[in-house]
Amino acid sequence: MKYATGTDNAMTSGISGQTNNSNSASTEMQPTTSTPTAVHKEATPTATTTATYANGNPNPNANPSQSQPSNALFCEQVTTVTNLFEKWNDCERTVVMYALLKRLRYPSLKFLQYSIDSNLTQNLGTSQTNLSSVVIDINANNPVYLQNLLNAYKTFQPCDLLDAMSSSSSDKDSMPCYGSDFQITTSAQCDERKLYARKEDILHEVLNMLPLLKPGNEEAKLIYLTLIPVAVKDTMQQIVPTELVQQIFSYLLIHPAITSEDRRALNIWLRHLEDHIQAAAAGLTNRSYFLQPSPQLVAGGSSTGSGSCSSSATSSSTASCSSVASSSLCPASGSRSSRTNDWQTIAPPSKQLQNKLAGDWRGSGGGSSSGSINPLCDNLNGITLNELASSQNSLGLSLEGSSSLVNGVVAGAGSMLGIGGGDDHDTSFSKNGTEILDFDPVTADMGEACSLASSSLCGRNGGNPVEDRSQPPPNLQQQMLQPPPYASILMGNVGDQFGEINRWSLDSKIAALKTRRSNSLTTQTISSCSSSSNSSVITVNDNCSNSTENLAQFANKPRSFSLSIEHQRGALINSGSDTRLDEFKPNYIKFHTRNVGMSGIGLWLKSLRLHKYIELFKNMTYEEMLLITEDFLQSVGVTKGASHKLALCIEKLKERANILNRVEQELLTGQMELSTAVEELTNIVLTPMKPLESPGPPEENIGLRFLKVIDIVTNTLQQDPYAAQDDETLGVLMWILDRSIHNEAFMNHASQLKDLKFKLSKMKISMVPKMHHVKPAGVGPNNGNINKPRWNGKTRKCDPKNGSNDRINNRKNSNDMLNFSLNCLPHPLPHHSQQPPPPLPQFDYNGYGGGPSHQPQYKSSSYPSFMGNPQQQPPPPPPTKSHHHAQQMQQMLQQHNHFPALPQQTPPQSHRRSLNNLILVAGGPQQPQQLIFKPGQGVLTNNGSSDNLGLERNQQPQQQQRKLSGGVTSAEQQPKKTMAAVVMENLAKFDQHFTLF
């Protein structure tokens, strides 16, 4: 059934709630509703059931006659779409069906595939029809027959035409040529009109065969592509109808046999065709033979589409596009084939065909095909541009309000692929920086190829427009390095209408007008052919100074990921996502190429921040890339700064062999540090390199020299104990190895590089972190925290209050020596943040306890211990009795009570590191002894006596009494002479003796 695809929800999305307009659209098409009426009756039960189920009734046996607005609306929609479908020609139907198929899910597509196969098998018709279809299918893929058609089309005289047919047939014997509906007449009396008719017949023949072209038939495809420039030139001379060429272009845009490179080769001619149609619609040609606007349209009405313009804003997008466009630019010739009469049906409308805009070049020429594109016409049956294509302007037509699209299926196919028309469609359709693709990337490439095909407005041939210099060479990829000659066949034979106007200036203004910074985040394709096509615009016109105009050929250029100074602020006005510096994804700039050594060109350009010019190198070989000059880059539209930078970088690529040779020699002789060599490798690893196995002289094998330097650096790091091994050098070297593993030049050596990277990773893990002091576990209050930095003695504070240069221990408690009596208390003090230490190491005079430290520069356990030196140890003190110590402590505490608390009286401070301090040693009648030690000496003796427990119990009442005394410290209550008693108390409590100095 013809409306099978209409059951998709996309068909009903664009015209909900517009019953009256749909009725009016159906009433307008009564002459063609005989067949659709039956189809409508047949479709009513199914439509009713579907709508009923959608409304919440799951019963499939619902009454079909039940009146519901949704059911009636769907039936009217089916009728409207069916009527429109019946009015379209074969090419228009194909384009619309292609657009609708992109909206279906996989099960629906498979169902349609089975249905199409069954229909092709059962409904081929009679044997005569079957034979005719087979013959057309064979001829469509026969290069000999297609070459005969091409020769016949390019021949002007009938006799030459016949000779060309016979000679080419005798030379080729690969495949037999079958007959078709194309016949050549040998009458010598053929006038110009009959010659035009023969050319038109040839185009009809090509139009019938082009959909049957099989993918993979490169020879036949090249003949089809070769016909395009000649047909476009004949269209500009008004020899053949414009609609035929538009239909051929529309098939080429969506044909699976046409690659992106082929579509880019068509960009010049598609843009020429568009400008010719616009000029013809504006009345600039000598005779408006095919595109004369109808009087009804100028008057504001049309016999076939009087309600189209009014319904375009409310009815189905397909119906509005078709009906409005069918009344916008109708062919005036009535003798044309019926399949070309309605060719303009799905073109977007032009509401103001006769407006003149002073700022537009078309307005200066005498007329303007002005019209703002109807937003609903940018939808195809409810399929918005956002749903059908990527967010970028996929035909590159950044159309202002004064321009219009190609009035044909080229525009229809472009709308299907996401043509933006007007300022509403220049904004980004991405959501949070994510592209929305409703179809496969192949179609996206096709849409971009269409955009690139419509991005060039310059004429191609100069001088005589009849001269055939427009045919592309057999190898289409060779056009990139040679900018083709340009001429002014843009207007065909109507150049005299422009008078004194400089065509080059006009072309550059057109290119600048249609160039808008792409809002897309994708970086898929840029036209290398279109880059070449605008070289004359850039070199001839001096007004094209800014980057927006110089990049006219990059109408669909990828979004730059850097807001560099090359892009002026004016180019960022309408950018929806340029302010977001997204994370660059390397897969966006990778492309598959058959040229050896060029697969990594994208990463190299990204490192230079010139990745938007990646498509210039897509079809280049490695040798061609090294021959690029700054003049060539500017000729293809690269800005002056970028071309200069890129040319300098290419010159540096030629010096890589000398740089690697120098690095290798200096590493072997020890004249270069490893960090310098690693830096040189970093600059080279991202550059394009040929594989090691590529033929050529060894001195030019950059990859081999690169691996030699890598081997020398890694061997030095692993084997040389004097090599500077640090985290930074190892990290950069591992990054270089990671990039080398994925480099095309080292694909056959990836396993060796992985092993080398693994060895370096183990070496990096085994390295000790820099600037961190390692302590054994259990030493110090932090229990040997390995991450604690060592204190540098040079950066520590000094003691300025006593005029001494000795450094102060940087601890929380930095009081003088008289605080010992306070710190002798066993209870934890409030200013201590550590956990209560065990009893024995509570007073640690090595600088880790709460008291003052008298050995700060030797607090680390990494310094040598003097325990094993018996010559420097004084004799151990004799053991004391517990009752003797208790009596001494009672006497000292009684002395403390005779001195009242005087907070304002501070005893004179003595230098706590002075060597003249008296240190009392336990034992005997407790006479003070003066011990003078040299720095670096220490005394540590152990005594197994542990009879100080009774003394601790006697201290508990005194400690509580001291807490209640008002918080006055013992240092403020005792004179300096009690120092001996304090030291004796410490020695009586503990068994370790430390020498303080």
From Swiss-Prot:
- Regions of compositional bias (Low complexity) in chain numbering: 44-69, 329-338
> What keywords appear on the UniProt entry?
Cytoplasm, Developmental protein, Phosphoprotein, Repressor, RNA-binding, Translation regulation
Q: Where is the composition biased (Polar residues)?
A: 1-37, 802-822, 854-864
Q: Where is the SAM domain?
A: 600-654
Primary site of residence: cytoplasm
Positions of region (Interaction with cup)? 583-763
Sorted alphabetically, the Gene Ontology BP terms of this entry are: negative regulation of translation; nuclear-transcribed mRNA poly(A) tail shortening; regulation of DNA-templated transcription
Q: Where is this region: Disordered?
A: 1-69, 329-370, 773-892, 944-972
In-chain residues carrying the UniProt-annotated modification Phosphoserine: 564, 575, 970
Q: Which GO terms describe its molecular function?
A: mRNA binding; translation repressor activity
Annotated InterPro entries? ARM-type_fold (IPR016024), PHAT_dom (IPR015327), PHAT_dom_sf (IPR037093), SAM (IPR001660), SAM/pointed_sf (IPR013761), SMAUG/VTS1_RNA-bind (IPR050897), Smaug_SAM (IPR037634)
As for subcellular location, the record says: Cytoplasm
An example of a Gene Ontology cellular component annotation for this protein is: cytoplasm
Q: Which family does it belong to?
A: Belongs to the SMAUG family.
Q: What does this protein do?
A: Translation regulator that binds to the 3'-UTR of specific mRNAs such as nanos (nos) and prevent their translation. Prevents translation of unlocalized nos in the bulk cytoplasm via the recruitment of cup.
Q: Tell me the subunit arrangement.
A: Interacts with oskar (osk). Binds to the 3'-UTR of nos. Interacts with cup, which in turn recruits eIF4-E, leading to an indirect interaction between smg and eIF4-E that prevents mRNA translation.
The written remark on domains in the entry is: The SAM domain mediates the association with the 3'-UTR of specific mRNAs.
Protein name listed in UniProt? Protein Smaug
Per the UniProt record, the source organism is Drosophila erecta (Fruit fly)
Q: What gene is this protein a product of?
A: smg
